[in-house]
């Protein structure tokens, strides 16, 4: 049903909150809406934002807890810690890093940061503004602050947990005192996180005495996502059906990009443009057989994974990573195999990291043969983790479907074809109507403007175009009046113009106001989206002055950095600013949610 909102000035909610709410209840019946109104009224009256016991003694110190999350893990851990602290009758306010007013940091007495790392050791996207502020000349001394940091990362990357390390070091440099040493968590972090939570809660309970009658407060920042969340999660995914897997690059393309449609049926799974889809996958049985043969194992041996007993073959297919090597795995395997070449790498961290990056697990075993026990080998490997893909559809148009735009990872090692774990699973091994286990990873840091009249600039080369297809479907469904400008790039026009017909229709219909295309291999000199941005610098600056929101999606290591440099150059040149002023201006756009990135 369609609901016409009253004047924003009369509402106790922001325009952004109203739009998010409307997107969630758009298909609710009048009966359901009436029930919801009573539900929310009851929630407000039964669960007030400040839970009070009879106030008596002076208010205790409040703990400020900041989650800097990239894929939701830091946020979930922060919520677990908040519950621990509340159970001990401690005051705690939980903030997403993007919502934290960082200039109030000088007033913080107890500061806890849980920080994910993305790309090449960079902070999570929502934490960039806070990170830059802490390293700026404006940041005050924090001599009256105590703090603790938990870092989340992945040992397959060279700068493991670098963002957590940076936050920890910088707070200490500013005069803050550690409550306990920083802890770094790998992909399978829950056990060390549980220990850290228990230790930190004990320290804080001793530091902050509580008495009967103390008023206990907690920021209740329930989002629309939480209110309307379904029962499907990473741990309990939805089993949906693969409806379509269609190659959308040409025969002559060096890239294999798939348009994937998944049927949600009557599951009730909900998502918004900007969200990601988590996909659980299985390893290629042929790869599993190759590994078993190289190790002289049968696959029928019994092993234990997370307390569950199963065959080695089943464990290798469904429970552990086989396509992502890490320096930790190389080091452990070197000791197990007693291989001199691998053992020599251990002393050279950079060489070890490079070897792990370039040599898949199967090829490492081929180079350094060994005959371990089945359980020994399983214990070397990391648990299988789902892959996240930017959603390329809007439920306003696709209803009970979710679409993905997936680049299939294909390469060769010494003449042997290798394929990405999840992308190969989707493209090569699943058939139409096959079951696929999925869940939604909400991303409130990549959302369309609340005001449909706001201009939008979308920058997404390659499969980075995915969320912008969802954006345009949503803007069309909403009848949004705001202008839309797309910057897209790929190697060749004839082979790699993803969703060409759809973009041409949007241009023809007037929904897509402008489109700039960068084909890097169609001429002698390479042209990328950042070059097109600079070429249109004056117009881009005009749109920014008109209030445009900027969105970037795609490769974090090169493209996103090059695009940011181009934006800084545009702001400096056309805004009449020096380098420092341009950087502050872009940081302000980020803080205002006018510059958002979904990079990986």
Swiss-Prot record:
Residues 63-201 form the Flavodoxin-like domain. It catalyses: hydrogen sulfide + 3 NADP(+) + 3 H2O = sulfite + 3 NADPH + 4 H(+). It comes from Photorhabdus laumondii subsp. laumondii (strain DSM 15139 / CIP 105565 / TT01) (Photorhabdus luminescens subsp. laumondii). CDD domains: SiR (cd06199). HAMAP family: CysJ (MF_01541). Pathway: Sulfur metabolism; hydrogen sulfide biosynthesis; hydrogen sulfide from sulfite (NADPH route): step 1/1. The lineage of its organism: Bacteria, Pseudomonadati, Pseudomonadota, Gammaproteobacteria, Enterobacterales. Component of the sulfite reductase complex that catalyzes the 6-electron reduction of sulfite to sulfide. This is one of several activities required for the biosynthesis of L-cysteine from sulfate. The flavoprotein component catalyzes the electron flow from NADPH -> FAD -> FMN to the hemoprotein component. Residues 235-449 form the FAD-binding FR-type domain. PROSITE patterns: FAD_FR (PS51384), FLAVODOXIN_LIKE (PS50902). Its EC number is 1.8.1.2. This is Sulfite reductase [NADPH] flavoprotein alpha-component. FMN binds at residues 69-74, 116-119, 152-161. The gene is cysJ. Its cofactor is FAD; FMN. Alpha(8)-beta(8). The alpha component is a flavoprotein, the beta component is a hemoprotein. GO terms for cellular component: cytosol. Binds 1 FAD per subunit. One of its GO terms (biological process) is hydrogen sulfide biosynthetic process. FAD binds at residues 323, 357, 387-390, 405-407, 411, 420-423, 600. Pfam families: FAD_binding_1, Flavodoxin_1, NAD_binding_1.
